[in-house]
């Protein structure tokens, strides 16, 4: 029997919010945001360059904003942003920024 190990998130998500574009994709079954949100909360920043990854790692300590980018499909990118005070995490499409 395999045991699933659930890790504690590296930071609080606060209130979870998704934009209209993300909500539409979720409602149509074109996007399951949960795996990407888990990755974000675990400190897996997705498709960022080294500089942005280091900025996020530093922001975990300093309390600055956290940003992740995930290439869901060749034509679909999902951004996740957690505010500096960890009060809100927003899931959005780049076109909605």
PLM segments and residue spans:
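Compact soluble domain cores
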Residues: 2-67
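Short, compact, well-ordered microdomains
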Residues: 61-97
């Amino acid at each position: 029997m395999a045991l699933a190990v659930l890790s504690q998130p590296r930071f609080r998500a606060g209130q979870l919010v998704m934009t209209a574009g993300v909500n539409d994709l979720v409602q149509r079954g074109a996007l399951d945001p949960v795996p990407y949100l888990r990755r974000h909360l675990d400190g897996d920043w997705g498709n960022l360059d080294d500089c942005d990854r280091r900025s996020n790692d530093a922001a975990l300590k300093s309390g600055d904003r956290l940003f992740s980018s995930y290439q869901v499909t060749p034509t679909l990118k999902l951004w996740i942003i957690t505010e500096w005070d960890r009060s809100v995490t927003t899931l959005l499409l780049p076109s909605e920024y």
